[in-house]
């Protein structure tokens, strides 16, 4: 099976290239197309966020706190820290009756350069809410409130909410056990074969139950909240309105689910082996 290759050229000559693996499957996990090692395992990083976000739905937090599809989109996001993103994350906290001081995701400036510059000009230091993972963490904390669990140490893999999320990820990837590490935002991260990641996205995109419908429609219907200006996931979902669910992650991993014109639904997962994110868009589009 041929691997995916993305070339970088200069003045008509190849200067560099990146190699990746990829797989397309249906909702049962049957392989439709393979590029390289479909069983290659990697940390799925932020590509897991649609599955992690399901905890808000399954726990009842979404309904109880009267959340909106926009809230759900930002809970599943790696947002750029634009005002619309931080406002929506703040709204999630307000609806759950808690504050952003509970966040334990760490601080970095907004990915969106104009937003970062605006903070600097105003003399305002970045806060945890500007972290691209703050929406995911807000969803985890709202789930803590809903299930009456303490938010203290909410990122510990043994915390009841992390166990709750772990069970969801195992369910959608048909896995008995999954090795977990620590993500860049300190949350647990899942080490999975590409085929299983693609299958999970196919299942969500097939909208086989209410929670899948809500995740797919929230993210594909509000692509700007999932990423932001100039972001690949946002651009891809905007190009095919409500037909694609796309979520990338650090170290050049990406997953998507898509609905074909004939109604068939597939999922894909791609990993650039050297972790260079500049190649991921081309590989996904191939």
Which residues does each PLM region occupy?
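Active-site-adjacent helix/loop patches that line small-molecule binding or acyl-intermediate pockets
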Residues: 68-177, 203
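Structured C-terminal helix/loop/strand segments within mature extracytoplasmic catalytic/sensor domains
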Residues: 202-286
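Short Gly/Pro-enriched turn/cap motifs at secondary-structure boundaries
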Residues: 11-14, 130, 243-248
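Short glycine-rich loop/turn motifs
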Residues: 17-22, 138, 166, 251-254
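Beta-lactamase-like hydrolase cores
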Residues: 1-39
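Active-site SXXK
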Residues: 44-62
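A short glycine/serine-rich beta->alpha loop
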Residues: 35-43, 75-79, 123-131, 182-188, ...
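Bacterial peptidoglycan biogenesis and beta-lactam-recognition machinery
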Residues: 57-65, 96-101, 148-153, 159-180, ...
């Amino acid at each position: 099976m041929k691997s995916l290759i993305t070339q970088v050229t200069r003045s008509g000559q190849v200067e560099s290239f990146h190699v990746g693996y990829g797989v397309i499957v249906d909702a049962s996990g049957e392989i439709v197309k393979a590029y390289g090692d479909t069983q290659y395992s990697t940390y799925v990083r932020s590509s897991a966020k649609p599955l992690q976000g399901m905890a808000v739905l399954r726990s009842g937090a979404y309904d109880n706190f009267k959340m909106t599809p926009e809230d759900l989109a930002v809970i599943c996001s790696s947002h750029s820290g634009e005002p619309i993103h931080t406002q929506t994350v703040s709204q999630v906290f307000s609806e759950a009756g808690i504050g952003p001081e509970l966040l334990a995701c760490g601080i970095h400036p907004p990915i969106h350069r104009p937003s970062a510059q605006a903070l600097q000009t105003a003399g305002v230091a970045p806060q945890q809410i500007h972290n691209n993972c703050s929406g995911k963490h807000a969803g985890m904390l709202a789930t803590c409130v809903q299930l009456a669990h303490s938010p203290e140490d909410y990122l510990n893999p043994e915390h009841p909410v992390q166990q709750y999320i772990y069970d969801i990820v195992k369910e959608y990837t048909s896995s008995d056990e999954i090795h977990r590490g620590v993500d860049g935002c300190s949350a647990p991260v899942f080490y999975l074969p590409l085929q299983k990641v693609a299958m999970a996205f196919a299942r969500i995109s097939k909208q086989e139950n209410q929670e899948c419908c809500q995740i797919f429609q929230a993210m594909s219907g509000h692509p700007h909240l999932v990423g932001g200006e100039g972001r690949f996931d946002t651009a891809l979902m905007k190009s095919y309105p409500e037909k694609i669910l796309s979520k990338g992650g650090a170290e050049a991993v990406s997953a998507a689910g898509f609905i074909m014109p004939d109604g068939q639904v597939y999922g894909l997962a791609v990993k650039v082996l050297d972790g260079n994110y500049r190649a991921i868009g081309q590989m996904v589009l191939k």
